[in-house]
Amino acid sequence: ERDNTTKKVILEARRYVENHYQDPSLSVEMICRELHMSPAYFSTMFRKVTGQTYIAYLTEVRLQKAVELLNETDDKTYVIAQKVGYQEQNYFSYVFKKRFGISPTKYRGTQNG
């Protein structure tokens, strides 16, 4: 019973992220208000079930969406950054490069080459 509740909460959290990843202010606190849980408990549970932190998951979702936009649009990097929830293009580029080992601009070049 408790297992099902936990899985349901994680599912809801993931769905919430999918629907709100564009919001730069999306935080653990925001999602916990939605789920009526304490941030500490939610964070522990999320990591236990998914094997990653909530922030790592949110970052992954945002970067996957960015990759889709880089592949499917001609939007400038700063536009894509904003569309996936990053207010600062430089920070977006930093996070992207840390994850993929290449800048968003170079990534696009390798895909369209």
List the predicted regions and their residue ranges:
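Short, hydrophobic secondary-structure boundary micro-motifs
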Residues: L26-S27, R108-G109
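N-terminal positioning helix adjacent to the helix-turn-helix/winged-helix DNA-binding module
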Residues: T5-A13, T59-R62
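Terminal helix-turn-helix DNA-binding modules in bacterial transcription factors
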Residues: K48-Q87, G109-G113
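Basic, amphipathic alpha-helical hairpins
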Residues: E1-R2, R14-L26, F46-T50, V67-K76, ...
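Basic/polar phosphate-binding segments, predominantly the helix-turn-helix DNA-binding elements
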Residues: E29-L58, K83-S103
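The cytosolic transmitter module of two-component sensor histidine kinases
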Residues: T6-I10, V28, T77
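Short Gly/charged-rich anion-binding patches and loops
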Residues: E12, Y41, K65
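N-proximal short alpha-helices
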Residues: N4, R15, H36-P39
